Curated annotation (Swiss-Prot):
Name of the protein in its database record: Negative regulator YfiR
Subcellular location: Periplasm
Disruption phenotype: Deletion of the gene results in the generation of a small colony variant (SCV) morphology in PAO1. Mutant exhibits slow growth, reduced motility, a highly aggregative and wrinkled colony morphology, strong attachment to surfaces and strong, exopolysaccharide-dependent resistance to macrophage phagocytosis. The deletion mutant, although suffering from a tremendous growth disadvantage, shows characteristic persistence behavior under antibiotic selection and during prolonged infection in vivo.
Taxonomic source organism: Pseudomonas aeruginosa (strain ATCC 15692 / DSM 22644 / CIP 104116 / JCM 14847 / LMG 12228 / 1C / PRS 101 / PAO1)
Function: Negatively regulates the activity of the diguanylate cyclase TpbB/YfiN, leading to decreased c-di-GMP production. Inhibits TpbB/YfiN allosterically, through a hydrophobic interaction between the C-terminus of YfiR and a conserved region of the periplasmic PAS domain of TpbB/YfiN. Under reducing conditions, may also act as an YfiB-independent sensing device that is able to activate TpbB/YfiN in response to the redox status of the periplasm. Part of the YfiB-TpbB-YfiR (or yfiBNR) system, encoding a tripartite signaling module that modulates intracellular c-di-GMP levels. The system is a key regulator of the small colony variant (SCV) phenotype, and plays an important role in biofilm formation and in vivo persistence. The c-di-GMP produced by TpbB/YfiN stimulates the production of the Pel and Psl exopolysaccharides, which promotes surface attachment, generates an SCV phenotype and confers resistance against phagocytosis.
Subunit structure: Homodimer. Interacts with TpbB/YfiN. Interacts with YfiB. The YfiB-YfiR complex is a 2:2 heterotetramer.
Keyword field contains Zinc-finger: no
Length: 190
């Protein structure tokens, strides 16, 4: 059996140092990846805000609010840009704040609901509180557009798109210009 080569203290020191440099560079790279992920989420949040401003421009309420009250309900991934506040092209401010899923006054407090991740029971509860009130409903997840929400975002790919639920739009109490359906076919780049 051949004997293993013995490492001199200087060789051992160099190899240990090389391993440490490699480990530190890997850890530093992980931080860069985290920064890239944060930047990507921030870009998508900003793109979501722009898509929503576009949708708002096609919607009319029976009594136009001076300030649009946007309620963010449930855990969300891309609502940070919304919560900072926005201004529509016509100069109307959009005030956004988080509201509890079980708040029975959502229909009177909100002109717009931005719905995050909620279970089916919570979703039904939200839409019961909106019944009879002119509230625009937008879901952050495109998979939930068949039940309740008027518009559902698809944020997963390189572009943000949305779907429109015509049945929910017809029953909502708000008027949505038909051109928004053309907007639904266009894509917004984050």
């Amino acid at each position: 059996m051949p004997s293993l080569p013995t490492l001199q203290p200087l060789d051992l020191y160099r190899r240990t140092l090389a391993c440490l440099v490699l480990a530190v560079s890997c850890l530093g790279g992980g931080g860069l990846w985290a920064d890239d992920a944060r930047t990507s989420i921030e870009q998508r949040s900003n793109a979501v805000s722009q898509v929503l401003l576009g949708i708002f421009s096609y919607v009319r309420w029976p009594k136009e609010p001076a300030v649009l009250q946007l309620c963010v309900v449930g855990p969300t991934e891309y609502a940070d840009g919304l919560l900072r506040g926005m201004v529509q092209a016509n100069g109307r401010r959009v005030h956004a704040e988080r509201r509890a899923v079980d708040n029975p006054d959502l229909g009177t407090l909100c002109n717009v609901i931005y719905l995050g991740v909620v279970d089916e029971r919570e979703r039904q509860q939200v839409f019961r509180s909106l019944a009879g009130h002119p509230v625009l409903s937008i879901s952050e997840r495109g998979t939930e557009c068949s039940v309740g929400s008027m518009f559902c975002l698809n944020v997963g790919g390189p572009r943000i798109t949305f779907e429109a639920n015509l049945d929910s739009i017809a029953r909502s109490g708000v008027r949505v210009h038909p051109s928004v359906l053309k907007l639904a076919r266009r894509q917004a780049t984050p």
